[in-house]
């Protein structure tokens, strides 16, 4: 279990027991379950992406309320691509380097990146997919403010390509200490997506 992560929150709809069982098994296999807590996802039938965005917003508010130094947020379709020893090693490399960070993505689909002086880390300029990411407590307010702005507009317009949580955050990425581990430690599982209301084949 990584001592570098204060808390792990996994987001799961009440009606997706299948996903709950899968993510909880992932966490148990990785010896992370004792540090994890389930967040009851906000259910917006027919507007899954709206519920998703509000869920991420509420998780960040919850992390702030609990004064966690950081939080690893996982969606319930997250699956690890590495074993627990590799994951622990990659986290240890990152945290022992004492790199000032706002967000560190462990799962991602990157459109634009820059190299860093660290072989285990890349600087994110533009990336999406919010299935697995670590947020530092000093950055909670910044993302909370952004999501509080975007979520109502998303609900009204359904312009998800602009206002969904993993799209709107692209406004912050270039100028923030926003990183991704060079080793992609996880991805979204393929399966039925409540956000898209259809089967999704996921490769990232």
Model features per residue range: what roles?
Residues 1-74, 78-204:
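An acidic/histidine-cluster motif and surrounding catalytic segment
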């Amino acid at each position: 279990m990584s001592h570098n992560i204060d808390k792990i929150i996994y987001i799961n709809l009440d009606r997706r027991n299948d996903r709950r069982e899968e993510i909880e098994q992932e966490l148990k296999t990785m010896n992370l379950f004792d540090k994890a807590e389930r967040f009851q996802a906000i259910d917006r039938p027919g507007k899954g992406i709206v519920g998703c965005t509000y869920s991420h917003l509420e998780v960040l508010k919850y992390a702030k309320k609990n004064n966690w130094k950081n939080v690893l947020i996982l969606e319930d379709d997250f699956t690890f691509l590495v074993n627990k020893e590799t994951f622990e090693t990659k986290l240890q490399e990152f945290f022992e380097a004492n790199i000032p960070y706002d967000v560190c993505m462990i799962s991602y689909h990157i459109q634009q990146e820059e190299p860093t002086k660290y072989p285990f880390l890349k600087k994110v300029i533009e990336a999406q997919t919010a299935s697995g990411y670590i947020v530092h407590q000093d950055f909670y307010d910044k993302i909370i403010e952004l999501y509080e702005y975007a979520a109502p507009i998303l609900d009204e317009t359904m312009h998800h390509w602009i206002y969904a949580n993993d799209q709107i955050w692209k406004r912050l990425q270039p100028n923030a200490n926003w990183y991704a581990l060079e080793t992609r430690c996880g991805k979204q599982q393929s399966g039925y997506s409540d956000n898209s209301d259809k089967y999704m084949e996921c490769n990232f």
